[in-house]
Amino acid sequence: MEVIKITPRGYCYGVVDAMVIARNAALNPTLPRPIYILGMIVHNKHVTDAFEEEGIITLDGPNRLEILENIDHGTVIFTAHGVSPEVKQRAREKGLVTIDATCPDVTKTHDLIREKVENGYEVIYIGKKGHPEPEGAIGVAPHAVHLIETPEDVEQLDIQSKRIIVTNQTTMSQWDVAHIMEKVKEKYPHVEMHREICLATQVRQEAVAEQAKEADVTIVVGDPRSNNSNRLAQVSEEIAGTKAYRVSDVTEIDIEWIKDAKKVAVTAGASTPTPITKEVIDFLEQFDPNNPETWKRERKVPLTKILPKVKKRGE
């Protein structure tokens, strides 16, 4: 079996920055305890488990403001997905120390929404309903931001303003965004289009679109809650034409998927730890469909190998 290691794949700079910020917080004895992360720092359970080992508590739920109400003291880290101004204000009111690990690309979208709304615009925002990134973006101007997810949602919009922009969640499929934006343009010909797919998402999707064409099957290593991981699987199937499966780690690979494959492509979401992906690649490279001894799937990566290294204070 040939393993096609799609490149680029895996960690993006926004994810690495967020994890380094959180690790530095864990190593800083001057910060009030406990230290909480408001939601999953990035959408990968291996990462949140590793932070739990470092004494950082992940509090997850569908609404950041509601989660915050459960915290009365200590330090709060805002995740890479961003939070609304209301969440930041409430944290200040509660006297909490806050650390912002928002991805710069997400901040850029928040700034765009803020600026346009101040100038009288209505904002159509293409994003995944229930995902924390749209939650934060909508929170910038709840009265003026309209969340849509599908072309069908465009038909339900009823915006009378002459000033409209359309923008999007940074981790969406660029092909989906382009298609939905065209639908918006048909309905509102005067709309301003601001595509905000982050570069890391874009190049990873394009790599899958091109490099997965040669494969019989694609394995995407990523958490089920990772939107960008799910979009990579979608791109493999819809753009490259190659059947794709998303797995959290090597233990989730089904032998039926790969036993007849001559070529298997592997990629990973932007929040997937590199050692977890390497374990998948190593398994596939030694796999022999005729030798059941090579079928054993066992995750051996320790949590201590999941997070990026940072220098301890004083080093």
Curated annotation (Swiss-Prot):
Its EC number is 1.17.7.4. It comes from Anoxybacillus flavithermus (strain DSM 21510 / WK1). HAMAP family: IspH. Pathway: Isoprenoid biosynthesis; dimethylallyl diphosphate biosynthesis; dimethylallyl diphosphate from (2E)-4-hydroxy-3-methylbutenyl diphosphate: step 1/1; Isoprenoid biosynthesis; isopentenyl diphosphate biosynthesis via DXP pathway; isopentenyl diphosphate from 1-deoxy-D-xylulose 5-phosphate: step 6/6. (2E)-4-hydroxy-3-methylbut-2-enyl diphosphate binds at residues 43, 81, 131, 170, 226, 228, 271. This is 4-hydroxy-3-methylbut-2-enyl diphosphate reductase. Isopentenyl diphosphate binds at residues 43, 81, 131, 226, 228, 271. It comes from the Bacteria. The active site is at 133 (proton donor). PANTHER family: 4-HYDROXY-3-METHYLBUT-2-ENYL DIPHOSPHATE REDUCTASE. It catalyses: isopentenyl diphosphate + 2 oxidized [2Fe-2S]-[ferredoxin] + H2O = (2E)-4-hydroxy-3-methylbut-2-enyl diphosphate + 2 reduced [2Fe-2S]-[ferredoxin] + 2 H(+); dimethylallyl diphosphate + 2 oxidized [2Fe-2S]-[ferredoxin] + H2O = (2E)-4-hydroxy-3-methylbut-2-enyl diphosphate + 2 reduced [2Fe-2S]-[ferredoxin] + 2 H(+). Belongs to the IspH family. The gene is ispH. Keywords: 4Fe-4S, Iron, Iron-sulfur, Isoprene biosynthesis, Metal-binding, Oxidoreductase. [4Fe-4S] cluster binds at residues 12, 103, 198. It is an enzyme of class 1 (oxidoreductase). Its cofactor is [4Fe-4S] cluster. GO terms for molecular function: 4 iron, 4 sulfur cluster binding; 4-hydroxy-3-methylbut-2-enyl diphosphate reductase activity; metal ion binding. Binds 1 [4Fe-4S] cluster per subunit.
